[in-house]
């Protein structure tokens, strides 16, 4: 190389250095002359940080440079790092300080002919390549964080902690979590359960744990067992508020054995039915998850040691409480909505649902004994009359010519229709209830009133007494008579609980029971002032 060439290169370098010192604008954004201003000290939106993978490089990038050289062919310098910054994203070594101003960095407007390592990976803050790659590994969205890192980081930020906590988060230091706590957290994450949710029992198809039904009698029930039933008093206060179901509660029933009547059975749309101690403690004694779909109906066996359940999964189960085993399992041809035991032969029960027929099952053989067919689509409720030789069924027929199908009286032995001209109004009857002393029964109607009928043929409806004031609005709102027969109780679609005088049909009391529709009400068979109610919101209340 000649001496003239060397002198020319030296003059160019000197001219470039003097020009860069004379300039006052910082690098970072382009002006009209193609220069770039430094915006590293300006707060960037989260989407424009280097962690998001977006670089502040101009559309007209630099020419490809030679590796190992400090200057590009056009006489422009490479981007330099601002070493004096101590905020997030600067050079990791804080001991190095830049003595003066930042040197200006300019870029040519011409498009690069090929991709360059420097132009494609220069971060917005102009840090060295090693620091940029280190930051990219830690904060880039393209590299997912581990679950423990994400958890520790969220906890640290949520506490607004000290710099030590932030440094701990940045360095990925995760505290040790015992195995027992990790398993509990994993279980709560998978099932979505909280601390206040009741256990839901074993998975469907498995036998539940045995429920010990001791020989003792509740101290609240014992004084009333050997005495005559007193007049029913109107409850005013809530004794227990039972929560545990994750879906609407369909039905509730007290245990029919008086000495064990502290137990309450509830069915729900969450595929379970539960047994509660609703008199002494208000705790859930056992949860049964035998069904794969909603449990629409369940009944205590008259012995008080077994529960018959049926649901939308077409399955029927008879469960022994003391052993937890299934004494009977059957499969119906339709979704089940109502079940009733025969009042005399406790090995026989009736089953109705989304079908035009009802079926009588024998538990001893596990087979269908008899079928009762009508031109309907669904059976809403079944009610046995005294001695069990006759029973009533309410259906969903509500057309103009449905006077022969709304309520039907059947002969149990011959499966013949005794009468089908019982209810002549264009309303369906979602529930039926028998009076304990008088030869009458009640029918809940979608006309927002309770109708009174005779239990003796021809089953005439009373025109003088009609119990009005509540709302049904399509819900399966239940109704019942008190054990003494002097009061009637019904739920309402607006959550209220209403009581009527049986003799005068006047309203005796109104309770603001639930926030959603109250669909079930039942008096305690022994305690004269205890009432249980359930709602479509999944909760139950014990009134006293």
UniProtKB/Swiss-Prot annotation:
<feature type="repeat" description="WD 5">
    <location>
        <begin position="424"/>
        <end position="463"/>
    </location>
</feature>
<feature type="repeat" description="WD 4">
    <location>
        <begin position="375"/>
        <end position="420"/>
    </location>
</feature>
<feature type="repeat" description="WD 6">
    <location>
        <begin position="469"/>
        <end position="510"/>
    </location>
</feature>
<dbReference type="InterPro" id="IPR053053">
    <property type="entry name" value="WD_repeat_protein"/>
</dbReference>
<dbReference type="InterPro" id="IPR015943">
    <property type="entry name" value="WD40/YVTN_repeat-like_dom_sf"/>
</dbReference>
<feature type="repeat" description="WD 3">
    <location>
        <begin position="330"/>
        <end position="373"/>
    </location>
</feature>
<feature type="repeat" description="WD 7">
    <location>
        <begin position="513"/>
        <end position="544"/>
    </location>
</feature>
<protein>
    <recommendedName>
        <fullName>WD repeat-containing protein 25</fullName>
    </recommendedName>
</protein>
<feature type="repeat" description="WD 2">
    <location>
        <begin position="290"/>
        <end position="329"/>
    </location>
</feature>
<feature type="region of interest" description="Disordered">
    <location>
        <begin position="183"/>
        <end position="208"/>
    </location>
</feature>
<dbReference type="Pfam" id="PF00400">
    <property type="entry name" value="WD40"/>
</dbReference>
<feature type="repeat" description="WD 1">
    <location>
        <begin position="244"/>
        <end position="286"/>
    </location>
</feature>
<dbReference type="InterPro" id="IPR036322">
    <property type="entry name" value="WD40_repeat_dom_sf"/>
</dbReference>
<keyword id="KW-0853">WD repeat</keyword>
<feature type="compositionally biased region" description="Polar residues">
    <location>
        <begin position="30"/>
        <end position="39"/>
    </location>
</feature>
<keyword id="KW-0677">Repeat</keyword>
<feature type="region of interest" description="Disordered">
    <location>
        <begin position="17"/>
        <end position="74"/>
    </location>
</feature>
<dbReference type="InterPro" id="IPR001680">
    <property type="entry name" value="WD40_rpt"/>
</dbReference>
